[in-house]
From Swiss-Prot:
Taxonomic source organism: Gamma-proteobacterium EBAC31A08
Gene Ontology MF annotations: acetate-CoA ligase activity; AMP binding; ATP binding; metal ion binding
The protein, known as: Acetyl-coenzyme A synthetase
Catalytic activity line of the entry: acetate + ATP + CoA = acetyl-CoA + AMP + diphosphate
UniProt: Mg(2+) binding residues: V530, H532, I535
UniProt keyword terms in alphabetical order: Acetylation, ATP-binding, Ligase, Magnesium, Metal-binding, Nucleotide-binding
GO cellular component: cytosol
Amino acid sequence: MPRKLYSPKHSSNPYIKDFDEYKELYKQSIEDPSKFFKNLANENISWMEDFKTTFNNQFNNAKWFEGGKTNISLNCIDRHLENDPNKIALIWEGDDPADSKELTYKELHDEVCKFANVLKDLGVQKGSRVCIYMPMIIETAFAMLACTRIGAVHSVVFGGFSPESLKDRILDADCKIVITADEGLRGGKKVPLKSNVDEALLGCPDVKNTLVIKRTGGEINWDDKKDVWYEDLVKDVSNKCAPEPMDSEDPLFILYTSGSTGKPKGVLHTTAGYLLGAHISFKYLFGIRPEDKYWCTADVGWITGHTYILYGPLSNGATTLMFEGVPTYPSASRCWEICDKHDISIFYTAPTAIRALMAQGDDPVKKTKRDSLRILGTVGEPINPEAWDWYYSVVGKSNCEVIDTWWQTETGSVLISPIAGITPTKPGSATLPFFGVKPSLYDEHGNTLEGSNAGNLVIEQSWPSQIRSIYGDHQRMIDTYFGMYKDIYFTGDGARRDEDGYFWITGRVDDVLNVSGHRLGTAEIESALVLHPKIAEAAVVGFDHPIKGQGIYAFVTLMINESFDDNFSYELKQFVAKEIGAIAKPDLIQNAPGLPKTRSGKIMRRILRKIAENDLSNLGDTTTLADPSVVESLIENKQSL
């Protein structure tokens, strides 16, 4: 059934005249990307030294703007000081509605320089890896920007990850310093960040210092040899620190994302290409105006927080809001109260949050005005049309454009999305590709699927902000993204293209789940489950979840003579939360005396997905199973859940 087409509500985008101009610019970006991006890089980046070549023409070993030197912090802060030093750069909204502050670009400059000097005094230098395990407080922005200022490579780990997950990421990136807070605050509850770091560091002997920011003043353990208070060090440092000239391809940050194998991948992004992608996507897609106040609800522990809370908005000289809390605390009106309080004009959130707020009904929204809003964005997973319609009609009062963006940690910036004021939208569709992005649909044999069709979503040519490597394992990067289709980037997502050429993302086609907009590898969760002494084997699949998009469904086979009940199910969920983090806790755990396997021993996840989804009449061919009776017992056990 064709979806309704929504024409843009706002007839103008400051940077693109109309839909025809978008199509012409897009054509130029695909036909001659070197010329197109050379011009954009010169127009949008402040260079310390000009680049010599635009692109090296190697998709799986891409290098953009070689020979050039720049600095992210210079582009995000210093270049705005001459014309608008007193413009608000950051608005911080605390977990408690009474707690908020604003910083101008000049104040941000001073704080970032001081933080950079503290890091230098602790021995951090160009190329050092710095782990940041922080709540959403304003010092987190200082820490990230300070790393970029001195050329250190930050590795931000989401504050919801467990000590075990944190340890793995510290070791993989070989970080010598961890930046954390005494505790975090979320939804009125304290998060024991320093305590988690202490536990993680028991397995990280090479970490020299833990730099601790005081957030709650709660009691924490202290190691005089290793732990240092930020507040003690920052008193004695200068508020001046020159930005380090960085080669275009110098590493900028590592961000871990889940893979279909157990070990998380350290996605490596580099300086100039990432900066350009973040800058131009934010500028064009949101049609940013000088008076805009922008709020992305993500955590900086995810790529959305990197690109669209900090680097995209700040490089454009915009005003960006950081929120410490959760959308439903202290009430389900919180998001919309913040929009009214700070006159937010652009609001960017995940479908999971939209569905959770939608479940609270219209009243919490209608208690607020929301008159300042002009653009509503969505990110992290496909948005179902019902949630899109509610977002558009109830939150936006049918007067705001909805910008449904598709991209990944590995892409660095948005690849498929409407452009505000330009692209007609359809509820549930990410619509059309951004400049320089050449998406296509392939079948499993590598054949191109033309016209209105469905298949595996691939990108056929490089773009500036693409992944450069997996930290310490470039071959894994090639195998993961360029192995299925030679020299073509495989996204791991399925999509369909309609008769208008619009793309509709249908979800993961590999063994990665998208839970509340966060990617989790099934292998990682399975590995955590089988660490439990009572578990012999585990298989994890996704199922449709009304709020999270995908829920986590675990099938577990117990060791001999062990028994399964509700208490043990609860124990297992807590066990996984401790190993990985609460975000990976299974929603449902089913006792599985046996798992459906082929004669070669491969688990047939297709059948497990059908059982998890309760699609029992459509299990497909089970003749290749070593023991087809296993399926009957799984269905029987399913009924008792």
